[in-house]
Amino acid sequence: MFREEGLAVIDADRIAREITVPGRPAYDAIVRAFGRGILLPDGRIDRKRLGNIVFSDPGKRAELEAITHPEIARGIASELYLLESEGRNVAIVEAALILETGRRARFEAVIAVRCGRDQQVRRLMERDGMSEEQILRRIDSQMDPEEKALASEHVIDNSGDVAGTRAQVRALAERIKSGDT
């Protein structure tokens, strides 16, 4: 929605997918760490299988994050540099773990997006086709939503309809574009 409001958006999940394709250093490190059993027949990483491993074992999750987070941070920095070279001095970085990874200081402001837990589970089940148990493990591995909201400069309530969320995004985008973060 921020993109629709004319702001540049960098998607950390997209970068994570890009750095984990065959031939990339993170891919090789992940396969070494977790074994070939996480691969699909075509050689790509089976993200659901890997997710089941790392969200069941905090040690394995830390191992994966030690591989991917530095690469994701480099990808974000590279995209920010490119945007800056194009004269764009404001960007939204979509990254669920900014606060958890200790990278908060790199950003001028943090925007938390939240909705009720049941609603979040339902939406993720519909979007990702995972079981409730799998989704709850992932949610429970992240920072408490209330803590995240308190640690953020802005909060978007995503529990209502799309029009309500869009109105909040539009208002915040206008503030950001005017330099009021």
Name every feature range the model reports, one short phrase each:
Residues 76, 104-106, 122, 126, ...:
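Small-molecule kinase domains that catalyze NTP-dependent phosphoryl transfer to phosphate-bearing small molecules
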Residues 45, 67-68, 115, 140-143, ...:
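Short beta->alpha linker loops
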Residues 14-90:
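ATP-dependent small-molecule kinase phosphotransfer cores
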Residues 77-85, 89-126:
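ATP-dependent NMP and nucleoside kinases share a basic, alpha-helical "lid"
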Residues 1-10:
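A conserved segment at the C-terminal end of the G1
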Residues 1, 18, 53, 60-63, ...:
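Residue-level recognition of specific faces of alpha-helices
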Residues 14-17, 115-118, 137-140, 162:
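Short, acidic/turn-prone active-site loops that include or flank metal/cofactor-
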